[in-house]
């Protein structure tokens, strides 16, 4: 049975390798788009009722939703600064949405102090965890244009191959092939993440024109 197969993948050793892995995941998620239909094609070419349960439908939809988070946040950020009145208020709302998961986790850690742990070490541990979470949010914000770009690219490639060309659906660059490449330099990062620079410059220009 396929459920008895174990697949092992080494954890990426740099950001670009992680991006390549997540791009593969996004393509795999969107290639399952036909499984959201009420009737699906079987191996012999005929169509039959979709055997997936409601929970399986929910998992598929949640994977698709996850790949659209970065593009949606980037669009909301642009509209917040350019397309709505009182942008400071809406920027605060967007920041609250972004920070709310971390705030809830920090509050949970702060309130659930083990009985045998003293207050000062507990506060230090909570502070270290909060700093790590907030640093992660800052990094995610800094690379948001790149995250949105590679997500949309993976989705577009999959939809093209799935609905139009119907070719190269199994064309992948595996993690082993990707990790065997030379260690990325600063120039490689700039080349791969040009969307960050372009997005920042565009936002500054548009903000100056519409402010």
Regions found by a protein language model. Name each.
Residues 70-71, 195-200:
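Core segments of transmembrane alpha-helices
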Residues 179-195:
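Membrane-helix boundary/juxtamembrane motif in polytopic membrane proteins
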Residues 1-147, 161, 165-176, 187-189:
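Non-transmembrane catalytic domains and loops of membrane-associated enzymes and transporters
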Residues 79-85, 200-211:
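Transmembrane helix-loop junctions at the membrane interface of multipass transporters and ion channels
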């Amino acid at each position: 049975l396929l459920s008895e197969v174990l697949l092992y993948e080494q954890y990426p050793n740099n950001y670009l390798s992680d991006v390549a892995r997540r791009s593969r995941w996004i393509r795999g998620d969107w290639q399952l788009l036909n499984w959201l239909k009420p009737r699906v094609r079987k191996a012999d070419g005929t169509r039959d009722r979709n055997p997936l349960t409601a929970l399986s439908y929910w998992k598929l939809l949640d994977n698709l939703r996850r790949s659209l988070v970065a593009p949606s946040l980037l669009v909301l950020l642009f509209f917040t600064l350019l397309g709505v009145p009182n942008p400071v208020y809406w920027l605060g709302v967007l920041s609250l949405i972004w920070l709310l998961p971390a705030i809830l986790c920090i509050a949970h850690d702060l309130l659930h102090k083990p009985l045998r742990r003293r207050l000062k070490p507990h506060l230090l541990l909570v502070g270290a965890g909060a700093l790590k979470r907030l640093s992660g949010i800052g990094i995610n914000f800094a690379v948001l244009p790149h995250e949105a770009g590679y997500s949309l690219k993976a989705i577009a490639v999959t939809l093209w191959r799935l609905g139009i060309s119907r070719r190269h659906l199994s064309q992948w660059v595996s993690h082993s092939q990707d990790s065997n490449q030379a260690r990325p330099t600063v120039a490689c990062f700039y080349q791969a993440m040009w969307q960050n620079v372009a997005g920042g410059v565009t936002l500054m220009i548009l903000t100056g024109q519409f402010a």
